[in-house]
């Protein structure tokens, strides 16, 4: 071989990763995986019994990835089975049904279960999470809007995608972004790069939007007690207006929350002499 012969570019090392799916029963976890891996939709619901395991190879950027997917049953009955599979995970697919508010509300419980099983030495900050707001094809029955789901995900530094296992909408984009983030994780020594954790808004802003969305009346929305004075109402309003003004807050749902606060103040001041 000649001394000046060009060297072949060395292929980047392939990766082997572990991914798990989490979420309540019947939210479409298995259907999302089948839609991506097998390019098909299974219309008949077949409950996952314990754990469904599969292996697939994908090419993302210039890397070959061997993915071990553990599709975990969502029914509480299978807790004793799935609790063995949380450890040594690089990626988590969190799924809820946009037409079932209870499946969205249960996401916190799923995270708590995982944290408990990982133990005191487990670090969930070094796992890539993607939240799938699934079944968006069923828009007539939607009970969790996009801004609410996106706020929950992004306030935790999670990826967020609107998906439909039935039509395939959002599925490929979700997996490609998910796997790309896991590559960055592995290339960064098993730690999420700092840039992937920035969300552009504060926890205080996210909490305020959630409280406003779930408030039962105008008093509750502004955080004042019934019978509050005009000055107390205006003070509470000014604090929220500064916090949530659309020009200063990029959190999902901030514009609607700001409008709701303006309307709440107007309604309360009409009845205060």
UniProtKB/Swiss-Prot annotation:
Keywords per UniProt: GTP-binding, Nucleotide-binding, Nucleus
GO cellular component, one term: nucleus
Molecular function in Gene Ontology: GTP binding; GTPase activity
The organism's place on the tree of life at top rank: Eukaryota
Signal peptide: none
UniProt keyword annotation of Nucleotide-binding present: yes
Keyword GTP-binding tagged: yes
SMART domains assigned to the protein according to its UniProt record, in alphabetical order: DnaJ (SM00271), RAB (SM00175), RAN (SM00176), RAS (SM00173), RHO (SM00174)
Domain J, residue spans: 217-273
UniProt binding sites for GTP: 23-30, 71-75, 134-137
GO terms classed as biological process: intracellular protein transport; positive regulation of ERK1 and ERK2 cascade
InterPro entries found in the cross-reference section: DnaJ_domain, J_dom_sf, P-loop_NTPase, Rab, Small_GTP-bd, Small_GTPase
Compartment annotation: Nucleus
Role of this protein: GTPase possibly involved in regulation of the MEK/ERK pathway.
NCBIfam families noted in UniProt: small_GTP
Family: Belongs to the small GTPase superfamily. Rab family.
Protein name per the record: DnaJ homolog subfamily C member 27
Gene that this polypeptide is encoded by: DNAJC27
